[in-house]
Amino acid sequence: MIRLLERLGVPRVLMLGFLAVAIFMTGDGFELTFLSKFMVDQGFTSSQASLLVTVYGLFAAAGGWSAGMLAEMFGARRVMMFGACWWIGIHLLFLGVAIPSRIYPLILGLYALRGIGYPLFIYSFVVLMAQHISPSRLASATGFFWTCFSLGIGVFGAYLPSFIMPVFGEYRTFWFALPFSIVGTIMCFLFVPKNKVVKGEGLSRKEQLKELAEGATILVTNRKILICAIIRIINNLLLYGFPVIMPLYLCTTHNGGINIFKTEEWMRIWGFVFVVTLIFNTFWGWFMDRFGWVWPMRWFGCAVLAVGSVAFYYIPQWFGANALMMIVASIIVGIGTCAFSSLPTIMTLYAGEGKQGAALSAY
């Protein structure tokens, strides 16, 4: 197994770090496929449920923007630990205080703040990858990184709650996320190495702020990075939008919902998106290292995702509660999503030496 990972470009010093990412993201993904339905069932509107995830995404974007530069400035492991501890602390407040209070502004605020944590954890690790892995193997290693990410947030993060929720209920299922996030944090502390280079050492506060600002200014100064960032945004609209709208569409009668699947059935259908990514994230990384990076994203990413998104809506309309056909749609979406797995690799190479963190912040 170790030799196989090394052939994929994963150095031994980072192997347990990849595992930490998978375990931590299992906790982060626990509520992804049923939070919007849970909120509607608690008496909130569909718009309020959607806004909750939208604002979470905005704060996650802020965390992602700062992650790369902070990791280069202060050390990736330090930023990963901060992000993980932030996530755990806010999650405790969200579950223990906000949800029981049923005060929507409090729920919205705490859930949004939690969104800062996980990008600091995972994207700081990508900075370490860029420093420890040669450019010729970086696409393959990045593909494996997204495989670990998908294993956590999508496979275990979708399938485990689908079996836990019928037994313990939706609210108690939220709490099962904590052990995974805590274990991932401990593994980060014990096994993730320090940066080879920490840019913030010896810099004044003014110079540090200037370095941090590069995560935004690079979008202006480097047109290729801007284009990659726009592609990333469009790609993620489906991956994070469908878990919000599809449970309302497939499992309720709210706002035109057709209510043909149970919530746990929907969770298992969506989980197939990420089961596929376990294979195709690594495959596309290997494939692009050998045959080029851009054209697979164009044809297997953009085009295939377009087909998958349309299929998710029309298959229930045409075939009813046909789980097998929905799984086929999930597989199509998974294959298309994976075709973008090397996008951060392309961005770091476009950025040039010493600006990988800024490029990943834009990502």
Over which residues does each language-model region extend?
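Juxtamembrane intracellular "pre-TM" segments in multi-pass secondary transporters
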Residues: 1-11, 195-229
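Cytoplasmic membrane-interface "Motif A"-like loop-to-helix N-cap segments
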Residues: 73-84, 289-303
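C-terminal ends and interior cores of transmembrane alpha-helices
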Residues: 85-101, 303-319
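Helix-to-loop junctions at the C-terminal end of transmembrane segments
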Residues: 64-75, 280-293
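Cytoplasmic helix-loop-helix junction between adjacent transmembrane helices
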Residues: 110-148
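Intracellular juxtamembrane helix-capping segments at the cytosolic ends
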Residues: 120-133, 338-352
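Extracytoplasmic gate region of multi-pass secondary transporters
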Residues: 31-36, 224-270
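Residue-level signature of mid-helix packing/kink "hotspots" within the transmembrane helices
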Residues: 57-65, 154-155, 274-282, 338
